[in-house]
Amino acid sequence: VLILVATVIHGNERSGREAFQRFFKILTDEKLPIRAHIVGIQGNIEAWRRNVRYVDEDLNRLWTREHIRRIRMGAFHPRTREEKILVKLVQAIRHYRSKLRPRQLIWLDLHCTSSPRGTFVVSTRHHANLFLASQLRIPLVLGLDHILHGTAIRFFSEIRNAVSLAIEGGQIGDPRAVHVHHAVIWTALKAARLIPREYFDIVAPHEKFLTEISEGLPHKLLVRYAHFIDSTYQFKMLPGFRNFDYVRKGMLLATQWDGPVYAPISGHLLMPLYQPQGGEGFYIAREIKH
């Protein structure tokens, strides 16, 4: 099994990088016998140095089939910083897959949101993805892969024998997001049966932590609406909204160049945008009861 832990795909979402470094130190210091090859991926280092989401364009919207096909053919000519990074990442991943020939690949993409209470896992509906996601003890969000194009988890979910999840650790800059990402890595390893049973006691506190921070939140949601924007929209979210807040149809949520923005449907608010960069102002999801 090859596990790729992706960090700073968005440069200002820094907790995943720190969490992986913490995880890797424990792994090497304790010499734990993990049944997998684990590789940390540092995505947009240029954006990380500047502490911004991206420099030229969103790296997590570039993982399209056409881009990957052209990179593999040597026919992709990058124009932006993020396109150059994409080429390096695709080539590095191809190298590890070719060298190790794993029976399974697991892509864990560590992110944060610009709004409070943003701890959840994003998955596609593929069975293997759903199984692993359901073991992480945090809310599960479905449907984003049909709304957002060019994301890494969508690309990896279409690879044979691959599992891909995006983990939102919490609000950008919140120290607890580091703990969430660290806990998720350990919990995912146990769920994938890559840790010997005699080491389960190492994972137990992480599972307890994830269960506690998810208390009172919906277990499973389906995204039903995305409010797309660009830099010309002058979009501004009203202050005070948090992830999972319940909003009713017609409720005032934001303003933009053409006037007020009202909730088009009722549901749980996800990822309300409180940073200058981003292509989506907010999402609305509905809880899946069954």
Language model feature labels by segment:
Residues 1-290:
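Structured catalytic-domain cores with a bias toward divalent-metal coordination
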